[in-house]
């Protein structure tokens, strides 16, 4: 089947698109939509993370769980929201840690992280879709087979990538990563429920750039400006 995904990723993942589990994902989504269910993000944005960050450009992977499930929030990038949408609490806590870590003031009314994606930060959710107002509703339809493969491909075929694993769910993916040639940084999830248990003070943004510079790669400019 012809999946609308950026060319470098299509080449890397081409074998996945014909596997039974992937065809089942497609069937599941079509069935839910035909039954009147609203699914986020919109179809054209399901692979937005891949379209914004080409495979050869990936230098950081920021792993989320599933897309935001409220109207207008999800646009295919983990933790990110479109222009005009107020940053959710987890993203506000990410901003607080950036300011504490590297002294950059972040825009309280702006949560679009596309600028990070364009620099090589793959903003990957483990599940690429969700039913409206039902968090975790697509956890068992097969997406994790796909995104686990994505993580493994990055680990196997690239070197010197930073994997940011926040919270237990993300940290369970550590087994997919070859830590002899990549950097894994772990912390609590930035959710208000857990940020004080080890996310605040983790300094992952400066640590990421320190590692990238040592690898001879450009550091990430984390600063965001309200358009």
What is each residue range found by the language model?
Residues 199:
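C-terminal substrate-binding/active-site "lid" region of AdoMet-derived donor-dependent transferases
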Residues 1-13:
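Generic N-terminal amphipathic, Lys/Arg-enriched alpha-helix
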Residues 15-162, 169-171, 177-178, 183-186, ...:
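A polyanion-binding, active-site-adjacent surface
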